[in-house]
């Protein structure tokens, strides 16, 4: 019997959730075999599902988490722990924060437990060459061993890349690509795959919108491109979509609109790295595709954990206009 068949998921999830309400930073040490089992079983499920997911509302969409495990628990407290709500995460689960292992293990455990209600996309940090440098490798090496980090790499190489919600909301981690002409191109990407230095897969995980760019521009990250509002409008029109939902950039209010509200950036790690005073946000999409935003305020700046206000209805006017906020690049 393989590790994945022996997984006691309820026990694993129970232990991961036990630290709720504890001082942030308290670790949960699963066994190496349990973690390996989570990686192997979730990898199997990722490969059994499409690389371009076709999802149905209602669901909640979350942006970058970056190892901020206690903030992930706050998101679930606020949005409802699975299976109470359906979730789509847009990538960047690991690196930078202190508890990448707890974060990714809980997400993988929920994926295995609720495979049709819980979805994870790949971010640019779910890539060996990136998380080797920005913290995840060191955390794996310190708490377990390098072999386990390699097992995570094999799992990450099988994550789906994009999702379309009810044929109207296109979701990915980074953004658009000059190479993307048809959705079939995404469907044709074979897994497992590393993230290449350029091309369609790279762009979907790395590109950024830029209000000062017309068409396509150079990206300050040194990878991929930036794209302007007209690129967004043309893409939506061509594919009969209403909205692009992406993550990948710190935004002050946890969410930020672009291109006349045709694109929204979500970032779900409040007080990112302890260096930014940003809120985190989660976007709730109801059955009518009305989108509203649930806000996690920066924890230490506010007595109340949460704030909530509603946002856009794709193709319509928002209830609450977005506040202007400065973007910070990760």
Swiss-Prot record:
EC id: 3.1.3.16
Upper lineage: Eukaryota, Metazoa, Chordata, Craniata, Vertebrata
SMART domains found in the cross-reference section: PP2Ac
Known partners and oligomeric status: PP1 comprises a catalytic subunit, PPP1CA, PPP1CB or PPP1CC, which is folded into its native form by inhibitor 2 and glycogen synthetase kinase 3, and then complexed to one or several targeting or regulatory subunits. PPP1R12A, PPP1R12B and PPP1R12C mediate binding to myosin. PPP1R3A (in skeletal muscle), PPP1R3B (in liver), PPP1R3C, PPP1R3D and PPP1R3F (in brain) mediate binding to glycogen. Interacts with PPP1R9A, PPP1R9B and PPP1R7. Interacts with PPP1R15A; the interaction mediates binding to EIF2S1. Interacts with YLPM1. Forms a complex with ILF2, ILF3, YLPM1, KHDRBS1, RBMX and NCOA5.
SUPFAM superfamilies: Metallo-dependent phosphatases
Cofactor: binding comment: Binds 1 Fe cation per subunit. Binds 2 manganese ions per subunit.
Pfam families, sorted: Metallophos, STPPase_N
Annotated protein name in UniProt: Serine/threonine-protein phosphatase PP1-alpha catalytic subunit
Protein source organism: Mus musculus (Mouse)
Active-site residue numbers: 125 (proton donor)
Annotated positions of the Phosphoserine modification: 2, 22, 325
Cofactor(s) the record lists: Fe cation; Mn(2+)
């Amino acid at each position: 019997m393989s590790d994945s068949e022996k997984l006691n998921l309820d026990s694993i999830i129970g232990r991961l959730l036990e630290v709720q309400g504890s001082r942030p930073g308290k670790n949960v040490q699963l066994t190496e075999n349990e973690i390996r089992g989570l990686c192997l079983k979730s990898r199997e499920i990722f490969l059994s599902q499409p690389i371009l997911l076709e999802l149905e509302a209602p669901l909640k969409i979350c942006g970058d988490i970056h190892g901020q495990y206690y903030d992930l628990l706050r998101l679930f407290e606020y949005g409802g722990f699975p299976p109470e709500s359906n979730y789509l995460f847009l990538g960047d689960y690991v690196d930078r924060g202190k508890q990448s292992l707890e974060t990714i293990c809980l997400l993988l455990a929920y994926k295995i437990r609720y495979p049709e209600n819980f979805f994870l996309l790949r971010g640019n940090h779910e890539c060996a060459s990136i998380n080797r440098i920005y913290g995840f490798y060191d955390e794996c090496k310190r708490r377990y061993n390098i072999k386990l980090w390699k097992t995570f790499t094999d799992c990450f190489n099988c994550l789906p890349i994009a999702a379309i919600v009810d044929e109207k909301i296109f979701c990915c981690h980074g953004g658009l690509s000059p190479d993307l002409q048809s959705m079939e191109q995404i469907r044709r990407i074979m897994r497992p795959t590393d993230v290449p230095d350029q091309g369609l897969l790279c762009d979907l995980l790395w590109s950024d919108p830029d209000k000062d760019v017309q068409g396509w521009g150079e990206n300050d990250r040194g990878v991929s491109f930036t794209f302007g509002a007209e690129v967004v409008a043309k893409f939506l029109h061509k594919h009969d979509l209403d909205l692009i939902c992406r993550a990948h950039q710190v935004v002050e209010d946890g969410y930020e609109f672009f291109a006349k509200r045709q694109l929204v950036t979500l970032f779900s790690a409040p007080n990112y790295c302890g260096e930014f005073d940003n809120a985190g946000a989660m976007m709730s999409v109801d059955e009518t595709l009305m989108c509203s935003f649930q806000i996690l305020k920066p924890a230490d700046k506010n007595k109340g954990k949460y704030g909530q206000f509603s946002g856009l209805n794709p193709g319509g006017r928002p209830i609450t206009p977005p506040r202007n906020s400065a973007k910070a690049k990760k």
